[in-house]
């Protein structure tokens, strides 16, 4: 059994997924920006499950970070046969009033890093004839999202890329699973600077553990695309039957509407 590599593993969904892999006896490579938080997760998992946990603190939004991570695992002789891309963030803002550095960081983390890690580790898995890849997308992948334009676009990228690569890897022993969750209690709302009435206050968010358990099961089944929660399933239906102009209005309302304070 090879290692499971999980990005964004210091908290939330990533930490819960790490625990699920460890419970099934998988050794782990866990990454996030904070070494201190990674060390805490490592200690708990090793003590509870008796697995080996390797930590690698890295900011995957930085240039060449995915290659650095792949070079590290390769140099350590770590064979990764389970890859989970969970790291990502959003920002509640008018697109033209956004901080461009933050928007660019979002593109790098949500799209570029995910794609490059899929490419590098996917090639290794294909050469070995087995492996699983899990990409966390969102209900946001199903429509355009005014006031969170870049985030919605990035999650549409994740879903499209995942489905296409899953098709290309048929018959190789490697599967790609894309899970689209709805609101989940992970600190997303605070990190995105959201306030007022929005999809977190208008719905009952899933817990990180609930979403992680669902995603883990779907990954192990080799599902290509999976929708978690009633809001996401409603979004999938809306994508098929409603006019795009209407879904944009719905998304803008659910995102909390126009931010009151412009960011420059």
Question: Predicted segments — roles?
Answer:
Residues 10-11:
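Conserved glycine-rich cofactor-binding loop
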Residues 24-40:
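Conserved glycine-rich Rossmann-like NAD(P)H-binding loop of the short-chain dehydrogenase/reductase
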Residues 86-91:
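Conserved NAD(P)H cofactor-binding loop of Rossmann-fold oxidoreductase domains
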Residues 94-107:
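Substrate-binding pocket helix/loop in short-chain dehydrogenase/reductase
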Residues 118, 154:
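Active-site helix of classical SDR
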Residues 138:
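Residue(s) in the substrate-gating loop at a strand-loop-helix junction
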Residues 178, 199-235:
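C-terminal helical subdomain
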């Amino acid at each position: 059994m090879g290692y499971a590599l999980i990005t964004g593993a210091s908290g939330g969904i990533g930490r819960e997924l790490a625990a699920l892999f460890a419970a099934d006896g998988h050794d782990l490579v866990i990454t996030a920006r904070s070494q201190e938080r990674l060390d805490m997760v490592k200690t708990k998992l090793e003590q509870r499950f008796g697995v080996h946990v390797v930590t690698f603190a890295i900011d995957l939004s930085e240039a060449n970070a995915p290659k650095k991570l792949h070079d590290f695992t390769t140099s350590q002789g770590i064979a990764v046969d389970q890859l989970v891309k969970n790291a990502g963030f959003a920002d509640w803002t008018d697109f033209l009033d956004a901080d461009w550095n933050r928007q660019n960081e979002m593109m790098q983390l949500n799209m570029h890093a995910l794609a490059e890690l899929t490419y590098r580790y996917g090639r290794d898995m294909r050469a070995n004839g087995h492996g699983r890849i899990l990409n966390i997308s969102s209900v946001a992948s199903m429509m355009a999202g005014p006031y969170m334009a870049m985030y919605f676009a990035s999650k549409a990228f994740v879903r499209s890329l995942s489905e296409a690569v899953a098709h290309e890897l048929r018959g190789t022993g490697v599967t790609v699973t894309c899970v689209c969750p709805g609101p989940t209690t992970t600190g997303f709302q605070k990190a995105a600077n959201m306030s007022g009435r929005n999809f977190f206050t208008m719905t009952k968010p899933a817990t990180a553990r609930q979403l992680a358990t669902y995603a883990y099961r779907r990954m192990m089944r080799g599902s290509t695309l999976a929708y978690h929660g009633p809001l996401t399933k409603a979004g999938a239906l809306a994508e098929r039957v409603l006019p795009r102009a209407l879904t944009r209005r719905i998304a803008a309302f659910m995102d909390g509407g126009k931010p009151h304070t412009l960011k420059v």
